[in-house]
């Protein structure tokens, strides 16, 4: 099996290169965290140790979830190969091992390079936090390395990626029609309904817990119950994952009906996205989850520190945001870059067909920009719905405490920043592959 994994990796290494941005940044985050923790423990700097721990905990968890989007797209790219393997007698378990083995191999190569650079990164990250919080909170720290930290840094990301790749590829291959195209999907439909029902129940439970706290009129209980908003953010992410790409496809059709146009850029962009639901789900899930997570966390922390009259509330909110959210945000953005690169490799055949039909490179580039704008509009619409719920709940908590909202910039700023980055990265990446193809 190991030889087969290596041979298959060599055969498809061009496609696997698209995963480098996500794996490289993941290895930087994990390495920075491990070197920082080891150095902080050595000098008994408890505060610094906790800050570095947050990177690996939240970064590792985010990486595990993001792997599913990359796996889904890779399986779609290698669909014909896996169908051939299935005809030759390969089982779902063997195909899952083949996918996870290649992902693990790629992750080991990239992590080895990332570990070296993360040692330098750890010192820069700590100095940045030190300037933000002050030397009283974070005294000087000398970053050191040992064999244990280096080995863990090299193999933690491949381990997370390998386990995640096996889990998600097994699940996706079971749900998809790659192995048995004519098999009915009744069990999948029932499982999906149960999945959504459980998440909806948890969502209603969170909303009910927050609203009911207002009837108690006890400040301590209200402040304690308000932390459920953070759990609600996780539920929102899971709901987005469950509803994608159905909700995005509905919105595309809805927009096409409301704003009918004869512009070839917009029309072709709409139909390109509808024809590739696998990629639509992958990039929309990542970006919508990211925007929802960032906006919700900012809205909650900035206003809650103010509600509780915390000294240096803005400073603490920024520190919390960096400690808890920096790793997930960076990973989500790099995951989107990886997904765009992977999809661009797949687009090469479509580009050749369109060129044969007489479509110029400039026209194709305009279509790609149109796709980027449509992606951005969809992300904005989905995130606004969930952000509005968080905004209303935070405002309600403020009313319970006799306060009003201090800052609502988190409702719109992250969305504009993230979708602007998406348009730029999407256009550059797609444009690059467009102009290098012959």
Question: Which sequence ranges carry the predicted segments?
Answer:
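Hydrophobic alpha-helical transmembrane segments that constitute the membrane-spanning cores
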Residues: 25-33, 102-126, 293, 297, ...
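Short helix-terminus and kink motifs of transmembrane alpha helices
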Residues: 69-76, 119, 123, 127, ...
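Short cytosolic juxtamembrane segments of multi-pass membrane proteins
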Residues: 3, 174-190, 434-438
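Selective transmembrane-helix segments that form parts of the transport pathway or gating/packing helices
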Residues: 13-19, 99-117, 154, 192-203, ...
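Short helix-loop junctions at transmembrane helix boundaries
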Residues: 37-43, 114-149, 210-227, 300-311, ...
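Long, hydrophobic alpha-helical segments
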Residues: 54-70, 323, 327-334
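Interfacial "coupling" helices/loops that link adjacent transmembrane helices in transporter permeases
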Residues: 65-104, 334-373
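Alpha-helical transmembrane segments, especially those used as permease/efflux helices
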Residues: 2, 6-8, 14-36, 152-167, ...
């Amino acid at each position: 099996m190991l030889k087969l994994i290596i041979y298959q990796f060599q055969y498809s290494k061009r496609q696997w290169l698209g995963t480098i941005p996500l794996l490289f940044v993941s290895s930087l985050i994990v390495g920075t965290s491990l070197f920082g923790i080891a150095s902080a423990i050595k000098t008994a700097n408890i505060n610094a140790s906790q800050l570095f721990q947050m990177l690996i905990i939240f970064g590792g968890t985010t990486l595990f979830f993001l792997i599913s989007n990359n796996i889904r797209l890779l399986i779609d790219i290698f669909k014909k190969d896996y169908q051939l393997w299935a005809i030759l007698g390969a089982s779902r378990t063997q195909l899952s091992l083949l996918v996870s083995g290649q992902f693990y191999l790629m992750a080991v190569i990239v992590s080895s390079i990332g570990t070296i650079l993360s040692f330098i990164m750890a010192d820069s990250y700590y100095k940045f936090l030190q300037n933000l919080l002050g030397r009283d909170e974070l005294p000087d720290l000398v970053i050191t390395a040992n064999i244990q930290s280096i080995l863990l840094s090299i193999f933690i990301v491949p381990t997370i990626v390998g386990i995640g790749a096996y889990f998600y590829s097994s699940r996706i291959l079971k749900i998809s029609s790659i192995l048995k195209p004519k098999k009915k999907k009744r069990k999948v439909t029932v499982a999906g309904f149960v999945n959504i029902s459980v998440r909806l129940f948890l969502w209603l439970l969170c909303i009910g817990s927050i609203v009911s706290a207002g009837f108690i009129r006890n400040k301590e209980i209200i402040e304690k119950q308000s932390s459920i908003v953070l759990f609600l953010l996780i539920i929102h992410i899971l709901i987005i994952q469950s509803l994608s790409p159905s909700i995005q496809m509905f919105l595309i059709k809805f927009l096409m009906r409301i704003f009918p146009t004869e512009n070839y850029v917009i029309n072709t962009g709409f139909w390109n996205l509808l024809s590739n639901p696998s990629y639509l789900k992958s990039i929309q899930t990542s970006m919508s989850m990211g925007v929802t997570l960032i906006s919700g966390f900012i809205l909650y922390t900035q206003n809650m520190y103010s509600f509780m009259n915390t000294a240096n509330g803005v400073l603490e909110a920024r520190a919390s945001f960096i400690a808890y959210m920096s790793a997930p945000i960076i990973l989500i953005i790099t995951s989107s870059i990886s997904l765009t690169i992977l999809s661009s490799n797949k687009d090469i055949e479509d580009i050749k067909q369109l060129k044969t039909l007489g479509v110029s490179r400039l026209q194709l580039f305009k279509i790609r920009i149109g796709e980027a704008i449509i992606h951005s509009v969809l992300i904005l619409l989905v995130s606004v719905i969930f952000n509005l719920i968080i905004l209303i709940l935070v405002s309600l908590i403020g009313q319970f405490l006799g306060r009003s909202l201090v800052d609502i910039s988190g409702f719109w700023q992250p969305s504009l920043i993230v979708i602007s980055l998406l348009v730029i990265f999407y256009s550059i990446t797609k444009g690059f592959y467009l102009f290098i193809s012959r």
